[in-house]
């Protein structure tokens, strides 16, 4: 996808705060500090559109970004960081679950995992939950520049086995080299087209 414009729209914690559900939305989910913000920034060619932080758990709101005036990218709060206060964790779960289960214009979810780490139980539960709700999912494996080719192949096998993935449900990505940018966009566009076709067939 050629990105001509990308802009921050709003942040929120509940549906009343979200933009009107007029544009298709692609949500980005994953553990804290897995490279979500960097992935979005590279996809839209805007280095500072989404703030990156070395402090896991920093993103505590659902953030909306409009791309080309025709698509919304949605940055969901990261999960699984032990030092985040329990009270905040309790708010995050319902907030994210409500968004994912009730947002009518959600087209697909990009689930992000770090190639240097085995998928956690939370990653597995998130994927199972999305599948149960029939949400289209692409798993993006980030930080691929941090490992050798042999290690990448080894970790890819672990990730596909642990998450029960087919190879075409996964894409490799590096924010440093921008490897995988075009493939991730291509996969997203396929899921968007499928979602549009499904919506037309159902008369929505």
From Swiss-Prot:
Name the UniProt record assigns to this protein: Probable GTP-binding protein EngB
InterPro entries: G_ENGB_dom, GTP-bd, GTP-bd_ribosome_bio_YsxC, P-loop_NTPase, Small_GTP-bd
Region (Disordered): 1-21
GO molecular function annotation: GTP binding; metal ion binding
Listed PROSITE patterns: G_ENGB
Domain of life: Bacteria
Domain EngB-type G, chain residue ranges per copy: 22-194
Gene Ontology, cellular component aspect: cytosol
Annotated binding of GTP, by residue: 30-37, 57-61, 75-78, 142-145, 173-175
Organism classification: Bacteria, Pseudomonadati, Thermodesulfobacteriota, Desulfuromonadia, Geobacterales
Residues annotated for Mg(2+) binding in this entry: 37, 59
Function per UniProt: Necessary for normal cell division and for the maintenance of normal septation.
Family that this chain belongs to: Belongs to the TRAFAC class TrmE-Era-EngA-EngB-Septin-like GTPase superfamily. EngB GTPase family.
Alphabetized HAMAP family for the sequence: GTPase_EngB
Cofactor annotation: Mg(2+)
A single BP term in Gene Ontology: division septum assembly
Organism from which the protein derives: Geobacter metallireducens (strain ATCC 53774 / DSM 7210 / GS-15)
Alphabetical keyword list: Cell cycle, Cell division, GTP-binding, Magnesium, Metal-binding, Nucleotide-binding, Septation
């Amino acid at each position: 996808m050629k990105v001509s414009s990308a802009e921050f729209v709003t942040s929120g914690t509940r549906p009343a705060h979200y933009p009107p559900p007029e544009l298709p939305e692609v949500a980005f989910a994953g553990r804290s500090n897995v490279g979500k913000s960097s992935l979005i920034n590279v996809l839209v060619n805007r280095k500072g559109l989404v703030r990156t932080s070395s402090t896991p758990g920093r993103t505590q709101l659902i953030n909306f970004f409009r791309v080309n005036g025709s698509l919304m990218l949605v940055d969901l709060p990261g999960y699984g960081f032990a030092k985040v206060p329990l009270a905040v964790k309790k708010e995050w779960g319902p907030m994210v679950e409500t968004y994912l289960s009730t947002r009518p214009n959600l087209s697909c979810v990009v689930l992000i995992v770090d190639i240097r780490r085995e998928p956690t139980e939370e990653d597995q539960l998130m994927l199972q939950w999305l599948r149960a709700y029939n949400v289209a999912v692409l798993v993006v494996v980030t930080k691929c520049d941090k490992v050798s080719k042999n290690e990448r192949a080894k970790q890819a096998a672990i990730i596909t086995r642990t998450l029960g993935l087919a190879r075409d449900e996964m894409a490799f990505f590096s924010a440093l080299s921008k490897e995988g940018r075009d493939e991730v966009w291509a996969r997203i566009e396929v899921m968007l087209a499928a979602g549009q076709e499904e919506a037309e067939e159902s008369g929505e």
